[in-house]
Amino acid sequence: MRRGLLLLNLGTPNNADIRAVKLYLREFLTDKRVIDLPTIPRYILVYCLILPFRSPKSAQAYQSIWTEKGSPLLYHSQNLVTKLQSALKDEYKIALGMRYGTPSITTALAELKDCHSLTILPLFPQYSSAATGSAIEKTLSHLANQEIIPSIKIIRDFYQRPEYIQAQAKIMKPYIKDNFHLLFSYHGIPERHIHKSGCDTLCPQTCTPIYDKNQACYRAQCYQTSLLLAKELQLGTHQYTTAFQSRLGKTPWIKPYTDEIFAELISKGIKNIVVSCPSFVADCLETLEEIGIRAKEQWEKLGGEQFILTPCMNDHPEWIKAIQSIVNEQF
């Protein structure tokens, strides 16, 4: 009998019009792990304040990156599945499930129903409750309703895996130039999520090395990712910076903020930067529009000169090999 491999990602609207984007945002933002408020305040916030104002802006942003093939996140993910299935041959049956939108986790699990074992791989290198935790919870809730539950292995995170670091670094390396500063921009999360992960206090600068207490700290995992990538790329500490993007609302999110770090870099005389987004394995709204368009415009307005965004791993052969190694090690 075949093994099943379930790849999980966040999701994308079905198209870039306001209605589709609003439906997607509604499903996304009402998730209790994303906005961790009690149900009634969460729904009031989402339905009365966020959706009416954010949906048109988000639709416009999606339209700026939408292609003839549709959503970049979706087609990169589908290409990944196709190439990974070819590489793994009959050893695994692979399905893609999106936490929000389509293809759904329910649909993906139906494709894998005849597999005697199931490896669940959320495509988030660093663990966060809002992304990884939510995707795993949704998957397990569906599996709980099956008559026959397969043997299950969950790969919670892989930020420290040499295969991931080496693949990411090889894809980045052609874009790294001697007179450029490297900015690692990770998706941010609210500070309170860090406290809920077991960290009593937030580290003032870089997080301390990973140990038992902060092993589930998203910020610590991101800083460790930067450290490992810089080492693989043979960069000194003065040659790169770590920051966090995509904050929403007025509550404090983990710092430093990507959009605020630009002025600091300019003040240091840095004019040319390369930006990489290691928390995203596939190019999407947050990389292509937020960084590739808006952040680039901000950099140029501040007096910056060259701005290079490295592509995500998408369906790159090095990423395919990395997943093969990570998954096969489970057995």
Curated annotation (Swiss-Prot):
The protein's name in its UniProt record: Ferrochelatase
Q: What does this protein do?
A: Catalyzes the ferrous insertion into protoporphyrin IX.
- What does the UniProt entry say about where the protein is found? Cytoplasm
Write out the entry's keywords from A to Z.
Answer: Cytoplasm, Heme biosynthesis, Iron, Lyase, Metal-binding, Porphyrin biosynthesis
**Could you say which residues bind Fe cation here?**
187, 286
The UniProt entry, under SUPFAM superfamilies, shows: Chelatase
What is the native source organism of this protein?
Answer: Legionella pneumophila subsp. pneumophila (strain Philadelphia 1 / ATCC 33152 / DSM 7513)
Report the domain of life of the source organism: Bacteria
